[in-house]
Amino acid sequence: VLVSNNYEGALVDLLKSIKVKEITIARNGLYLSDYENIVLAMVSSSIKISVNKANIDNIRIAKEKEEIKIIRDNLNRKAMTKTLAFIKENITERELAAELEYQMRKEGGDKTAFDTILLFVERTSLPHGMPTDRKLKLGDNILMDFGLSREGYKSDITRTFFFGKGNNFKEMSKIYNVVKEAHKKGIEAIHSGISGKEADNSAREIIKSNGYGKYFGHSLGHGVGLEIHEAPRLSPIIDNVLEGGTIVTVEPGIYIPDLGGVRIENMVIVTKDGGVSMNDTPTDLIVL
């Protein structure tokens, strides 16, 4: 760890000490001023510098064992389980999201990996909705999409719960089981060498065949690591090939306006023998 109020100079000193003559950096993720300062420091020290975002992103796709361990540890902390104990009638989306984020901090998270999505009843049909002062009522469903960041690495998980059985429980439980089956098929399809498009299609066909195709409007998943969204993509329009050691999300969903939505999301390691879920939380339908 370098501690300095002149990190460009400290970086140059480090590179010189190990006799580095040329470096490649990724422009994305840097403030323009930081990027310019690094370039100027390298030029003045005669260290060659080049920018190649694509190659650096590609190097990051397959994760090393230590990276996988950090991400797995991030996923399997108990913030969600502890938050469920706080669920009660009339709690707001905002209050429950705050409790979940507090529990993630208590569980060792440095910060949230992204803005927590926590929604009730018909608002669960918004794939990326933000918490409001909407109050929870008996019979509502609850969608939680959250993750923590620790040591720079992100986690991403979604679960949908039911707070009792409301008037729409029969239809929503049917939707839940379709999403659960699509989630299972998506994970089963994954292995090194498959394309993101093929993986997406394996889950999407389950949803289409049950008559909900038009209500699944996003890709099946994405890579996760130092960024919450990184390569590769599991998408109907992108043909990237999955390689071993990659970590991706599998997150099918069905979202029906004015009724509600269901999404189930796990993070999955790609291996030559198949996709291996990193989560230890169940995907069974749970009525609280």
Question: Language-model segments: which ranges?
Answer:
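Active-site neighborhoods and metal-handling regions in enzymes and metal-associated proteins
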Residues: 1-288
